[in-house]
Amino acid sequence: MLAAAALLPFGAASAQTVDAAQRIAEAATRFLSSLDDGQRQKVLIAFESDNRLDWHYIPRNRPGLSLGEMRANQAEAARALFASVLNQRGLELLDGVRLLEGVLREQQGSFRDPGRYYVSLFGTPGRFPWGWRFEGHHLSLNVALPVAGRISVTPFFVGAHPATVRDGPNRGFRLLGTSEDLARQIMAGLNDWQRQAALIANRSFGEIVASPQRERDLGEPRGLLLAGLDGAQRNLVEALMDRFLGTLAPDLVAAQKRRALEQGISAFRFAWAGSLTPGEAHYFRVHGPVTVIEHDNTQNGANHIHAVWRDLTADFGRDALADHYRRQPHR
């Protein structure tokens, strides 16, 4: 069974998460140690800064230190920081986003730059609360360790433009293609009433709903309830969820599986909007009580994907922080 939320509790089996928190802090400290004073000043931002919550996936100026500004050893230390949270598939997802930025650079010019992906650290590594972000065009990974025993990894956004590379040395590359294929398998395997329950709109939405500052627009979960699926159908939905949730380091995934059992995966719903014809605009999502995974492919002739994993209570470690401040008011 897959994870249902991004907030990772210690609980009785907390040793793995304790190790993860220490590993992440050590990787962040090593990264900081590789920087000179000027670079360190660019990277370090107060945890309380509004910027920590100001995530986005459009090409824009960002705080932090870009990969393009780093020396080779610094870029290696940054990658080790990413690897403290992500597994190999997760790292390949980051690489794929930047590869596609290179494809766009060839088509559109230097405005597109695989080096313009920025690392920011919020607070002091190992001293709660603290966290970090890796962000650029079509990528936003937000890691927060708000209190001892909590790790949040959302919002986690990945985009793919082009969704399918149509020419050049990377022709045929589909960064998020497996997600679309799984979603189409799910829809193809439904009977008529299940398909009608899953279809929430005849046209795609044109964008993810839970974009920055808009997560409330999602409302209550809609679509086909997973409790009504048979085992094979549910396995496909879980495999679809795993395209995001399964990108984390093994110990973090293990903690998420415990969380999933608490939340109950049967309460999730699968929804589709738009055309079922390959190559045409479509949207789908898996939405539970607090967790949502969205995928929209509408722009540029349905060759431009926006996908996101949100935890609607634990993004940025918010619920852990709120609980902490209730218990220990800060003046």
Where are these regions (language model features)?
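N-terminal export leaders
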Residues: 1-2
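Hydrophobic alpha-helical transmembrane segments of integral membrane proteins
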Residues: 5-6
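Charged, amphipathic alpha-helical interaction segments
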Residues: 9-10, 32
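Sec/Tat signal peptide C-region and signal peptidase I cleavage site
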Residues: 11-15
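A cross-kingdom marker for long, charged
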Residues: 16-87, 91-331
